[in-house]
Amino acid sequence: MKRTATPDSPALFDLVDTGPDFAFELEAKKKGFWPVAGTDEAGRGPLAGPVVAAAVILDPDNIPKGMDDSKKLTRQKRESLFVQIMETSIVSVASSGPGLIDSVNILRASLDAMRRAVLGLEIPPALVLADGRDRPPGIPCEAKAVIKGDSRSLSIAAASIIAKVTRDRMMERAGVVHTSYGFEGHAGYGTPAHLRAIESHGPCALHRMSFRPLKRD
């Protein structure tokens, strides 16, 4: 994201979304922090299934083209970039299941998945760029929280794509096991069809009982 001024009013600025770039990473390298990993999660909002986190260290000489916040990409584009990222980057994935989510809350479960994803990288990073307002605790390196990081940092964007595609595939498999809920279609989100299925069949082991409307007062 960068600011540009119109020629006739240089004091007024328009926000222009140019997509993520490698500026955070290169600035960190100038300061002696290298390599840099990006981390992000997928699945904080659904009523069912895990929250999945990924950590990615990109090869600066071989960065896949077209990366962005995974939510802005088509499924086909995400799948294509997933393959490219896996082939060119150092990648680690971790997840927190419904039990942990219900036990400690979704934010802590998400940050813990990020922490484990970072610790699982084959090469330890000198700096971690984490999407959002919070830094994952318990990692043995510097960390920086980047608000809307998946739209600003290519490393975080890559992590968002890996996390999203991984979680979607997990929920597709869950739909084969738990056939009454349609997980393969809505990935656990609270769609009308999913809510009707819960009403008809009750919750299953994948449901987050601390989330409304599953939570009982």
From Swiss-Prot:
Compartments in which it is found: Cytoplasm
- Pfam families from the entry? RNase_HII
User: Keywords of this protein's UniProt record, alphabetized?
Assistant: Cytoplasm, Endonuclease, Hydrolase, Manganese, Metal-binding, Nuclease
Indicate the secretion signal residues. none
- Tell me the PROSITE patterns matching this sequence: RNASE_H_2
Q: Which PANTHER family match?
A: RIBONUCLEASE H2 SUBUNIT A (PTHR10954), RIBONUCLEASE HII (PTHR10954:SF18)
- Broad class of enzyme this protein falls into: hydrolase
Q: Which GO terms describe its cellular component?
A: cytoplasm; ribonuclease H2 complex
The gene it comes from is rnhB
Family recorded in the similarity comment: Belongs to the RNase HII family.
Key word Manganese present = yes
Assign the protein's first listed, main location to one coarse class. cytoplasm
In this protein, which residues make up the domain named RNase H type-2?
34-217
Which cofactors is this protein said to need? Mn(2+); Mg(2+)
- Report the GO molecular function annotations: manganese ion binding; RNA binding; RNA-DNA hybrid ribonuclease activity
The EC number of this protein is 3.1.26.4
Q: Which CDD domains does the UniProt record give?
A: RNase_HII_bacteria_HII_like
Q: What does this protein do?
A: Endonuclease that specifically degrades the RNA of RNA-DNA hybrids.
Q: Which organism is it from?
A: Agrobacterium fabrum (strain C58 / ATCC 33970)
> Which InterPro entries does UniProt cross-reference here?
RNase_HII (IPR022898), RNase_HII/HIII (IPR001352), RNase_HII/HIII_dom (IPR024567), RNaseH-like_sf (IPR012337), RNaseH_sf (IPR036397)
> Which residues bind a divalent metal cation per the record?
D40, E41, D131
Q: Which reaction does it catalyse?
A: Endonucleolytic cleavage to 5'-phosphomonoester
Q: How is the cofactor bound?
A: Manganese or magnesium. Binds 1 divalent metal ion per monomer in the absence of substrate. May bind a second metal ion after substrate binding.
Q: What biological process terms from GO does the record include?
A: DNA replication, removal of RNA primer; mismatch repair
| Taxonomic superkingdom | Bacteria
Q: What is this protein called?
A: Ribonuclease HII
